Amino acid sequence: MKLTCKFSTMVALIAVAFATSSCGTKRIVADGSVAKTTTTAQKTQNATADNSSTELKQMNYLRKVADNAVYSKNIVSKIKCTISTGDNNISVGGSLHMRRDEVIRIQLIPFGLMEAGRLEFTKNYVLLVDRIHKEYVKASYSDVDFLKRNGLDFYALQALFWNQLFVPGAQKVTDSSLKSFIADFSASPIKVSTTYGNMSYVWNTDNTTALINSVNAKYSGGKDGNTSVTCTYSNFKALGTKKFPTDIYLTMSTKMVKNASKMSLDLQLNTLSNDDDWETETSISSKYTQVGADEILNKLGGL
């Protein structure tokens, strides 16, 4: 009975298709203008179908990229941190502590003995601590001219360090916000891009796994010049059920920071864990001297 029903349905569909095509043929003989209308309608339908197919392909791929983000609330690792300022390369051991939506902390610990410096990003402030000279910078994102002009807030920086897509000005990527991204399948690797005001972002993704291999954030500053920050990811390893890069390499190009074009930061993660037994806030001793906010990057550029 089911087979008969399916067969009848198939015959009916073929009959309708045949009747439609036959009707179209008769109209060609009777009225050429109607035939043109029919052809135009068919082209419109085909174009609509193609657009729907392209949009579906876009969304499926963008979801795949977004779904590669790790589930962990915490990412902790011992690191080898290499800071290049052009003429000088400084390599030192340390640690990376990140808690989603709360803090990103890089600690520099030479020979694993004593902390020499600390760079910390939270939702409300940026903190740079120089343990050697007992100085520190603590400022909101709006107080740091470089971050303010380039639209870099905590969530943008978090996405860079966590190897994931982000929507400028938003805390997280939703299925709805994925519509603001474009996947360029003609490029290899596949490029995912979006724009926000004077900012443009391009993520290079692996054609097969959709893992993010690099991201470039560019700010068009007009008279102030352009600023570009590039983050490259490699050596992916398992972190829970997902993969996370164990080599994160950042470079920058801007006129707003001294020697910025020569600066780079390379973080090699030696151990990955989701340890949560650590404090998210750093307390500063009264013995430390606070310096100006704009020195937060110029201090590094002057090394």
Each language-model region and where it sits:
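Edge/loop elements at the starts and ends of beta-strands within beta-rich repeat scaffolds
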Residues: 67-75, 86-90, 97-99, 208, ...
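Flexible, processing/modification-adjacent segments and terminal tails
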Residues: 59-61, 131-200
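Gly/Pro-enriched, hydrophobic low-complexity segments
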Residues: 5, 25-29, 173-289
